[in-house]
Amino acid sequence: MEEMYVYKNQQKLRWGYTTGTCGTAASMAAALMLFRQKRVSHVKVSTPKGIDLDLEIEETRFTKEQAVCAVRKDSGDDPDVTNGIAVYSRVSFRNDKQETEGYIWENGGLCLRLTAGEGVGTVTKPGLACEVGKPAINPVPREMIFTHVEKVCKQYGFQGSLNIEIFIPQGAEISKKTFNPRMGIKGGISLLGTSGMVEPMSEKALTDTIRLELHQKHIAGLKSVILTPGNYGESFLRDELDVNLDYAVKCSNYIGESLDMAVQENIEEVLLVGHGGKLIKLAAGVMNTHSSVADGRMETLAAWGGACGAGEKLIREILESVTVDQGLKLLETVPGLREKVMEQVVRRAWEHMALRAGESMKTECILFTNERGILGMSPGARDMLKRILAQDMTKLD
């Protein structure tokens, strides 16, 4: 494949291609081998992004009845746990038209059936792009596979029935490192992608996952959900507040966008629970809390410290602090000052949330640190948490 690059934050990063593109290339190559009865070393795949890829084919084998081969995933410079895995396709002749737990493509006298084998997940929850009980092969990869195999069939004048089986031997193990089990994909990974390409360090991939989780919560009947930025928040919810994490959606640094998406998915209430190191930024109106976007943590603590009575020396010491915990420790040198400051920080964070969400969705927030526990909460946070936990979870199972 000819390498493609994009520049992000002054870094030159290499594009990759999706599991869906791997499945497409492997299926096309297997179909070619079945008809030619010869090994295939490369195939050209057209992606929805308009980029043609020349991909290497591995582990080829064939008989007169079937052909099998693999294409290895290359995620480029994107930190993807599926990078390097082999995606296999087995294409075989079929004479029957029995239903399978897969997908069917018919055009004239041609019938293609796409099924999943080892390591490809099965959808177990509604709200995904695939029906419950079907293989987790999303619509765009499905169409790519069908159109590329159909092209081969037309090339050889084939009219009849073929079965296309995608399998990924490492899929079940790798899926444990992904969001798949949480989103309702069991037993393996998905064939994903809308463009056929992997954009390095793509924010869209993360926000798409957040939107999908919010959508699943909504269609399962939840009107109120918890947002939390990361692992600290999930641990605090589970260990300190005894919250089942099925009520929560991890929003990473995308607090503003997550609130927008919750509104769009008709969620009625959102409780944001997060570590002070993240959510103190929200008190300054920072809606993307990634360190590369903005900071302002010490400035926020120092400003409210001054507003609540801290002297000039203490303000300067707070500004020179490296961590939020250091800043809080300095505030604690004055009795009652930390509590006053955090009351204002929580109020401002809550106000910024409410402003972003608008009138159609209620918002509350809870700030904590691992060392100090809850630092503060907005007025309705406790009651909102009770309402969230009172919701029926059976449709999420």
Language model features: what each stretch is:
Residues M1-K177, P181-M183:
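Generic N-terminal targeting/processing segments that precede catalytic cores or assembly contacts
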Residues E2, Y7, R14, G20, ...:
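A structural signal for small-residue-enriched, beta-sheet-centric alpha/beta enzyme cores
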Residues F62-E65, Y88-R90, G108, V132-P135, ...:
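Short, low-complexity, polar/charged sequence segments that are solvent-exposed and flexible
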Residues G133, L396-D397:
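Short, surface-exposed secondary-structure junctions/capping segments
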Residues K362-T394:
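Short, amphipathic C-terminal "tail helix"
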